[in-house]
Amino acid sequence: GLIPGPIATHAKETAGVERRAVDAALAAERALGREPIEMPHNNTGYDIHSTTPEGDSVFIEVKGRIAGAEDFTITLNEVLLGKNVPAAHRLVMVEVSPDGPEHDQLRYVAEHFRSINLGDLAATDVRLNWAKTWDRGTPPC
């Protein structure tokens, strides 16, 4: 099991934040009339595969952070999927409120990685500014 202390507490809190974020994204997808399926945790590239009423796929990467977070990390696989299928990709950002799930806020950032060029950068992940990325988002789409 986990060793008690700050690291174990952080891991437990992180898992709770991620769970609330995914739950919020699943609910938003259902509200849009789509059929979302949560992917296994080890799925590379996206967290939710959603199907539109027309049968089209939407690939959703969910990032949840406690309100006030400065940044977040996105993996190279997540960026590459968003670049390869830009029209079908959504980055869903969920600001998790300490006041409970009913106060969580959600933004969709469509086609965020369309024009990104990592060149020969030997990166495994990229850290993005939460507020600047949040500002590019919209209500669920």
Labelled PLM ranges:
Residues 20, 32-34, 62-110:
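Catalytic cores of nucleic-acid endonucleases
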Residues 1-14, 19-20, 24-27, 31:
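Charged, non-catalytic accessory extensions
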Residues 45-46, 56-57, 88-91:
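Short, surface-exposed beta-edge/turn micro-motifs
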Residues 88-141:
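Domain-level recognition of nuclease-like catalytic cores that cleave nucleotide substrates
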Residues 25, 29, 47-50, 57-66:
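Conserved catalytic cores of phosphodiester-cleaving nucleases, focusing on short active-site segments
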Residues 9-16, 36-43, 79-82:
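Short, contiguous acidic/charged loop-to-helix segments that flank catalytic cores in large enzymes
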